[in-house]
Amino acid sequence: MYDPARDSWEERDGDEARSLRGRLASDQPHAGFSSSEQIYGASGENNNTTDLQHPGPDPKTTASAKVLYAESPPAQSTTQTPPSISTHVQSPVNPAAQEASNTQSLTSAAQNQSNKSTTTMDNTSGSATPKPRADPSDKSNRPDQVASPTDQNGSQGDKKRKVPAEENASEKSQPTPDRPVSKRKRMEERHQKLRKRGRTPPSAYSRRDADETASAADRNGPTYRSTSPLPPPRSPTPEDQPRQRKRPGGGARMGLVDRETLRRRQEERERAQVEEAMRASQGRGLADVVRQHYNAVPQRGREWRKTESKIKGLRSFNNWIKSTLIQKFSPDEEFLARFNGTKDWAEDGGVPPVEEKRLLVIDLGCGKGGDLLKWQLAPQPVDLYVGLDPAEVSIVQARERYNGMKSGRGNRGRRNPIFHAEFQPKDCFGEWLGDVDIVQQVGIDPNVGPGGSVMSSRWGGGGFDVVASMFTIHYAFESEEKARQMLRNVAGCLKKGGRFLGVCPNSDVISARVSEINAKKKERQSQAKKEKTDEAPEDGEVEEDDGKVEWGNQIYRVRFPVTTPEDGIFRPPFGWKYSYFMEEAVEEVPEYVVPWEAFRALTEDYNLELQYRKPFLDIWRDEKDDPELGPLSERMGVRDRATGELLMTEEEKEAASFYHAFCFYKV
């Protein structure tokens, strides 16, 4: 019996007997009238019109209708009543003709149903444990059974679930009392049977739970790792040769070597460390010496340099030479073409227009900032000045001088607004300038020089208009690497058409002095062999028996600690060190010869073309009558206003002849 409230089938006592009687009754098409009343009664709950139109059908017709209604498939209809009954009720034809046609159709359907029931009984009787099958038509004979209502499509609820023949056979083999009472228990039993037959793939949640269970089992229970094969048994160590136990490391093997070998190895390691330290110190030794020297130079004011200095004439002359270089070569070609032949920029009241292009200048070896005022008086205004120097104390003093210029102190002769300046300690020849922040912002080309790209050599370049190096490049010729690093920094900072201005010792003067002294020394040695007497050296020359060369006067002195070439040609061009002394300025600082031809050949590798080169005294003779530079020399105390003579002693002139100035263009 189907209970809609519990959604289950319940069997009562005597159901099997009634099922058997139903099967026997199905063999007889005209069993009785009571089943017909139940069918019409069940349908009458949903359709009252049927009961009114058929108050009492005959037994033959109702029995056939019962069999047809139970076994025929559901018809597709949108009504809630069985299609066959509703059609029979609502037909408007003659009742006598309709009754005859219904009787014929129901009789044929009853005969087909009787054949099917007979076949079913034969198949069931052949099983090992026969069990009578309950006929669906017999459900109408039960007084407490209510016909299952049809769904919207006309199908009945008892026809929804179909059980295969194998499951029916297995269920029939089980005893009736052990069968689950509810549908839920039967479904669980069925699922258990299906799980025994074949395992379905687990869901994601089951795999997750299985992983957690497995991890817990790994922690708490025995592991299921495969057993690895056992290692082969080791042969026992002979007792007469026990293994000697030692600490790990090289120290454990020291006992195997004699003490003399260990001492010799230790000495070799110490000697190698000393040599490496010497090589490292040689690379930075000169820069350290120069840095310490210039940091120790005391700061003297302008008044002392003009009154008490012993070399005040030489100081003024050197400053005038640097001003001449800045005035002649710092402006670009456009600026010079605009004022060509007019020298309007020389007038104090001639302020350049506001839209005029301003210069970007970097000074390699700026020292204490002694050239700041010279750049402030440049014909083309300066927008940015970057000062680099290896001496930290000099950088501090240069920054203080610049701050004094900004505040109004020392603005003598200034006709342009003060430029922006930045200072930073830096080894300009031994290190790459690309790591300086302000240089990176302005621009520096790392691809200049040999090995650079062709496009960089033609179109590349830095962002500075002028690179200045006053009295400094001779420190770079300690080695070829330093010299090339210096030129790489210069060429990398310069833009196309930029100028490289500088002042350095004149190698022609050094070569002439060295060859002259060596010739006199050789002549004296030849005369000494004849007379066996030594002649006193001439004035200004000092000769030593060990072959060293030295010359100078009371103001300056040059001394070579090594043997110099007899002809005065320095080969190779790098590493020819000498000591230079300048009164009140330089105290025996090591410097290096800058062979000019070798230097010019190196500059060609970095796209630097020589534009100007002259000794100091030649520059004076050429520019002393210039309308701008001539009066400037008088204001700087280089020339006497009354006589026009150069205000320097002969010793100062000799010291000034040791230098020359140059200018290269970036092409």
From Swiss-Prot:
| UniProt biased composition (Polar residues) | 33-52, 88-128, 147-156
The EC number(s) this enzyme carries: 2.1.1.56
Q: Which Pfam families match?
A: mRNA_G-N7_MeTrfase
Gene name? abd1
> Where are the residues of the annotated region Disordered?
1-272, 521-547
Origin species, per record, is Neosartorya fischeri (strain ATCC 1020 / DSM 3700 / CBS 544.65 / FGSC A1164 / JCM 1740 / NRRL 181 / WB 181) (Aspergillus fischerianus)
UniProt site positions, description: mRNA cap binding: 368, 374, 401, 474, 591, 659
**Where, subcellularly, is it found?**
Nucleus
Protein known as:
mRNA cap guanine-N(7) methyltransferase
Its organism's taxonomic lineage begins at: Eukaryota, Fungi, Dikarya, Ascomycota, Pezizomycotina
**Binding, mRNA:** 318-319
- What Gene3D superfamilies has UniProt attached to this entry? Vaccinia Virus protein VP39
